[in-house]
Amino acid sequence: MESQQLSNYPQISHGSACASVTSKEVHTNQDPLDVSASKTEECEKASTKANSQQTTTPASSAVPENPHHASPQPASVPPPQNGPYPQQCMMTQNQANPSGWSFYGHPSMIPYTPYQMSPMYFPPGPQSQFPQYPSSVGTPLSTPSPESGNTFTDSSSADSDMTSTKKYVRPPPMLTSPNDFPNWVKTYIKFLQNSNLGGIIPTVNGKPVRQITDDELTFLYNTFQIFAPSQFLPTWVKDILSVDYTDIMKILSKSIEKMQSDTQEANDIVTLANLQYNGSTPADAFETKVTNIINRLNNNGIHINNKVACQLIMRGLSGEYKFLRYTRHRHLNMTVAELFLDIHAIYEEQQGSRNSKPNYRRNLSDEKNDSRSYTNTTKPKVIARNPQKTNNSKSKTARAHNVSTSNNSPSTDNDSISKSTTEPIQLNNKHDLHLGQELTESTVNHTNHSDDELPGHLLLDSGASRTLIRSAHHIHSASSNPDINVVDAQKRNIPINAIGDLQFHFQDNTKTSIKVLHTPNIAYDLLSLNELAAVDITACFTKNVLERSDGTVLAPIVKYGDFYWVSKKYLLPSNISVPTINNVHTSESTRKYPYPFIHRMLAHANAQTIRYSLKNNTITYFNESDVDWSSAIDYQCPDCLIGKSTKHRHIKGSRLKYQNSYEPFQYLHTDIFGPVHNLPKSAPSYFISFTDETTKFRWVYPLHDRREDSILDVFTTILAFIKNQFQASVLVIQMDRGSEYTNRTLHKFLEKNGITPCYTTTADSRAHGVAERLNRTLLDDCRTQLQCSGLPNHLWFSAIEFSTIVRNSLASPKSKKSARQHAGLAGLDISTLLPFGQPVIVNDHNPNSKIHPRGIPGYALHPSRNSYGYIIYLPSLKKTVDTTNYVILQGKESRLDQFNYDALTFDEDLNRLTASYQSFIASNEIQQSDDLNIESDHDFQSDIELHPEQPRNVLSKAVSPTDSTPPSTHTEDSKRVSKTNIRAPREVDPNISESNILPSKKRSSTPQISNIESTGSGGMHKLNVPLLAPMSQSNTHESSHASKSKDFRHSDSYSENETNHTNVPISSTGGTNNKTVPQISDQETEKRIIHRSPSIDASPPENNSSHNIVPIKTPTTVSEQNTEESIIADLPLPDLPPESPTEFPDPFKELPPINSHQTNSSLGGIGDSNAYTTINSKKRSLEDNETEIKVSRDTWNTKNMRSLEPPRSKKRIHLIAAVKAVKSIKPIRTTLRYDEAITYNKDIKEKEKYIEAYHKEVNQLLKMKTWDTDEYYDRKEIDPKRVINSMFIFNKKRDGTHKARFVARGDIQHPDTYDSGMQSNTVHHYALMTSLSLALDNNYYITQLDISSAYLYADIKEELYIRPPPHLGMNDKLIRLKKSLYGLKQSGANWYETIKSYLIKQCGMEEVRGWSCVFKNSQVTICLFVDDMILFSKDLNANKKIITTLKKQYDTKIINLGESDNEIQYDILGLEIKYQRGKYMKLGMENSLTEKIPKLNVPLNPKGRKLSAPGQPGLYIDQDELEIDEDEYKEKVHEMQKLIGLASYVGYKFRFDLLYYINTLAQHILFPSRQVLDMTYELIQFMWDTRDKQLIWHKNKPTEPDNKLVAISDASYGNQPYYKSQIGNIYLLNGKVIGGKSTKASLTCTSTTEAEIHAISESVPLLNNLSYLIQELNKKPIIKGLLTDSRSTISIIKSTNEEKFRNRFFGTKAMRLRDEVSGNNLYVYYIETKKNIADVMTKPLPIKTFKLLTNKWIH
């Protein structure tokens, strides 16, 4: 029975009894055991509340039941062993308790565990005497002590006493940690005192007041054992018990001795940290006090070295001694003795000056009394009204400063000044006043509030309407607490304490008075010039005097800094009693923290939660009384109103009522939030949260996706954390029915670990309220933190993590405890916390340069999980760091945008709050700011790619990152950065350098090529054979010299001259010097490879020009060279490094024949246009061939593949059926049917929105008179061919709106019901890109319009019928159409004719010939795409005029007027455009791709290394035949079409760099092998990784007289199946890429020259059409140019020889090019292969080359 009772006795939870007494609560001269009555009373009240919530079972246990342990242990479980105690038992009433007695105050069984085998164990009988409770009810401290009246009664008297008094004694809390033993002992001693055992407690000398009895010793021993388990005892206690396990008295005596010692040490440390000295006391006394403290600490083992001691002393100096703070910059090794010598010297000088001062104003005793009564305090900064310029004044805005704490400032007197004074009195330093040369101040005691204030003077302020003064000594006839409302220049209220008169006695013996207001909350004493003018006194800044209107000089004006001042010596002191003015000053010790500051510090939690937390000590360091709660009720935080805005309050009590009780960490709630869009790839898009049911402890983890393996990793992590940290096992996890939780992988994992998944039931959202409310709370906090700090959105999860840390430490109003307390963890030390987004400076100890700034501006995010550091965001490095080496930036607002956070700043409050933590770190951790050997603990844990939304440059104003000077030199405010805030460093990331901290000019991204490489048409291969062309004699010396270099390079451009192998000097377009490069002809190579005569004569013309430019046409107005420079100047060509000319040996030998098996190609392109591919080494350096394609996907095969050629036969494949299947494959359905959207839609909110959209569409149809509503027709009477099926489709647009559309089934429309000759025209993409480019260059306004229900404006000519909409309920009837319904074959053409006619007739537009849907007049250009219109105009009013005309006929909606001069964002035909007029335009599709790609079900690899190129050279598609069944074949073909369809859409819109890969894979849609699918997945993965890339355009130079249209062409010879060549073209208008094309040549070419001719001929027609369009839209002259890297092609175009064309196909193409060049002013120029950006259109390239050719125009 005893063991069963013992097992049922639960442990007493930590903190359930009275709170522990900390060293903070013990004063210097107070006994450590003498806890104040108020504190004890609060402790008793808290304990009473805690015990009142606990249930007690009288029959089983007197100890309150712990709610954390709801499930009792079975009786069969053996009793737990408690450390060294051999056995446990239960002391019943028959053994040790007198009848009716227990230390809980009512009959019960006491947990009693004596040593039964020890001689000290005496089982007491029923008559044993135990101490009784007092008969009177009162506070525990009022209980009579045992020594004064300790009485013992029998059990009967005890019963009567307990019946009458009902006095309860509360037990001490359970000891849960060795570190908590000192605090626990205090509560245990109070427990003994309340139990009338105070007399047995040892005193300071170690002896009790009276002798302890055996029964008392037994009681003492058993209670100590119960509440102090042995596993939680400190080592020194265990040592005592190991000698004598009953010597509890010795433990108590030693504990009291330690408390005495610790109290003295704590008091010394606090005193040393808060030293203040301003000369008001003798310097000898101050030195003695400090020396004694330091000696005591050193004797007690706390070593305070000179460095730290001097730092602490100087920190407390003020007044005349303040400048000694900066002595350490000159004397780093200053000792305490040397510092006190300086203090003594200043004190003696100060005393001497005081003795010599006249005392006609006030006597010394008055000054002392005033000093004591008006001790100055630190106040929040308040900016006074700005002095404005009057006459010749040069006044500037007064800056805000903290009010310092000096009581005695230097005083000066102004000497007499003659009336003829005209020279200004210019003071360079405030200390000039007390040099005794010109001016001295009056003896009026004045407080120096600001560093840049002139002591003893009033600031002249022309902008202030009232005079304000901080000192009450000059106020006459004062009245307290006036009802006056005063605001500063920023419209912030200034509290006014009193109003009175300010009396002047000027040097001409005249007296004047003005009204003055008293307030201590200003930075300067302000003298209003307006009030002086009211009494006929003006300030003359020419003479620098105050004078009357008659010219009488009254007083001089002193200029100090940027302001003008007048001395206070002219003020008459008052005899006012200082205490009559209320709240003039508040002492430093009683000043409270403002509530807005605490509100912001604690993550914007509400006031009630903060007060509960402070009351229950879940937030340490300060108490509830330290906060000013006066403004908490009415305070409205603007950031909370914005960030936490909700529709309505959450319904309370929405938890499941039937949920069982579990022990801590056995029942978890979890939920996932996300995705968050428009973030960089490195930022998480989701987070998953967990909440413990019992403790309400919360965890959050970031996620980049919601895949099964990602969720499984998080579950594995948190289960291991709970098991290891809390020794608990999770039994149940409650979650919703999302696929991330219901998948098979997670279900098996939970089943394997014995965890029960608890899913929410259908339509039961209340069951998941815990997790959902947590996510809502965290998101509210996140929005508020980002709004408050102004940090970029990609740091959103850091705000979530900061909020989680704080929320776990805040007390719940219901349980009165925090989650950390429930979990048994210590409270949050707020002194280690910084506000989210707090500006800081992080130290860089290892810069590249010694003159480089060592401070990196950053923003504090949250405490680190993995160290004692802080996570800080560094915008300049685009990183977050984990470091303790930072300094809080003072005097700067934390917001990064243009809004001010608040009227208050909290620099002083933050200093006070963190002073203790920052000042008493180990001495080896306190570093000087100018120490050149500081280490750092930078741990750059993550690289953050910044969102285009950059942080605002508030920090750049304080510490410019581009400056080479230290941050402290920029503003005076930065001088006030506390040096003690520098944390101890550990290690620094070696990657921090000047290059990545400071912005610099844009560096070239050109790679340093260290090997001799040939890149014929872009393919880079190392040459291991001699080249063909010998060096000319003119360049032999230069080449020989260059060949001696170890790092030499050569050009990859070779002459196409077959007979003359001389070098051709090349004019570099990249700004490098001319080079001599050998040239090799394509024809010579063809001879050696193919062994037959060339198909085209490539002989050069008669004049072998040494210049590489071969223009065919020379205009009369522009020279060839100028034309070439004009065309190439603005092209986005790569910058190449300068190359040294290289000497080449003998010509090539006979080349081996080409391998016939290599006629096929791949994404790697085996047949580069370089004719030497067959002889080049395939081995490349690791750097060149690096692909960064490291993925975990098993389906991606990286083996060498031999060919892209599709198989000539497929087993078990019906080819004709497959081709038809491909043509009939339907696109991805993104819409819903009527039954899906409305009838069976279980989402009530979404269903309501679709119903609303449905009725809106029906109303629009009726409004437009879409059908004849007068007559309904019977189905049997109408020809079935004229009946068109109809349906409603529903979809959700990207902006979140729900839309319904009534459409006709045009896909099954009979051909007799429409005219097949009619066409539905839309604007061509090249026309749109051309218009956008011209708009940028000409500063056009771009207006985007949308015409609602456009097709319904067009009448229909044919007789067609449709079924009525479902809501009419007439299934057997038909209605006749009158308008062009969406879906009909003829609707698009009807609408085009309708809108075209209206634009021409009513709007005065005309359609550009050859370019459908492009309309123009003299002012406006319109691009039409169905119902979307894009208007371009130089004058916005012209656009508005067109809009007005359109609105007369059509329902026209303005999507974007485009009137702003800032960046404007458009969504035009799928392109996401960012346009700033006159500057730039960026085109991308990031949002669209983020939405569409995940829907393709492609196995994306977000955690793997991101791809740097869409493919890699050297990979070939196998020739193996497909052996799959027909169903699988169709499924894969369908998948290929979806993937390639999306890729083609993106590629032809703006991602022209992907067109080669898209075109090559598109040729294999009918060959969906595993390898082809893998390559397609790789392409989609690259698109996903680079979805944020944009096509970048910059405005053309305004001085350019012409429009320049250029086509850059390239071809890759024979690298496609059946020896076909790949050709590619890129089109540029004024240097901006507007289009591109990559395709397989239709004819088989027999040489590289033929392939290049074919590529150029394909580009000419589009070039001419674009030229016509540009001339129609813009009247500037146009220059057309063609660039190619084939010299032989240029020679053929220029030549007039027609005899050597081998066949007519390419002969006609060449002749056509000659005609174009000669007749259409087309210029043809040569471009180096390394600069030919069209190379990406014809072959796969190494990563470096791919980036080099594309990073100038798409990034």
Curated annotation (Swiss-Prot):
Q: Which GO terms describe its cellular component?
A: cytoplasm; nucleus
Q: Which InterPro entries match?
A: Aspartic_peptidase_AS, DNA/RNA_pol_sf, Integrase_cat-core, Retrotran_Ty1/copia-like, RNaseH-like_sf, RNaseH_sf, RVT_2, TYA
Tell me where in this chain the Integrase catalytic domain is found.
660-835
Regions of biased composition (Polar residues) lie at 1-23, 48-60, 127-152, 1005-1015, 1054-1082, 1101-1111
Q: Where is this region: Integrase-type zinc finger-like?
A: 583-640
Q: Enumerate composition-biased segments (Basic and acidic residues).
A: 1038-1053
Site feature location: Cleavage: 401-402, 582-583, 1217-1218
Residue ranges of the region described as Disordered: 1-93, 126-173, 352-421, 956-1087, 1092-1111, 1130-1171
Query: Which reaction is this enzyme known to catalyze?
Result: DNA(n) + a 2'-deoxyribonucleoside 5'-triphosphate = DNA(n+1) + diphosphate; Endonucleolytic cleavage to 5'-phosphomonoester
Q: Which domain of life is it from?
A: Eukaryota
Tell me its EC number(s), please. Answer: 3.4.23.-, 2.7.7.49, 2.7.7.7, 3.1.26.4
**Swiss-Prot/TrEMBL keywords:** Aspartyl protease, ATP-binding, Cytoplasm, DNA integration, DNA recombination, DNA-binding, DNA-directed DNA polymerase, Endonuclease, Hydrolase, Magnesium, Metal-binding, Multifunctional enzyme, Nuclease, Nucleotide-binding, Nucleotidyltransferase, Nucleus, Phosphoprotein, Protease, RNA-binding, RNA-directed DNA polymerase, Transferase, Transposable element, Transposition, Viral release from host cell, Virion maturation, Zinc, Zinc-finger
Share an example GO biological-process annotation for this protein. Answer: proteolysis
In Swiss-Prot or TrEMBL terms, this protein is called Transposon Ty1-OL Gag-Pol polyprotein
Protein's organism: Saccharomyces cerevisiae (strain ATCC 204508 / S288c) (Baker's yeast)
Which gene codes for it? TY1B-OL
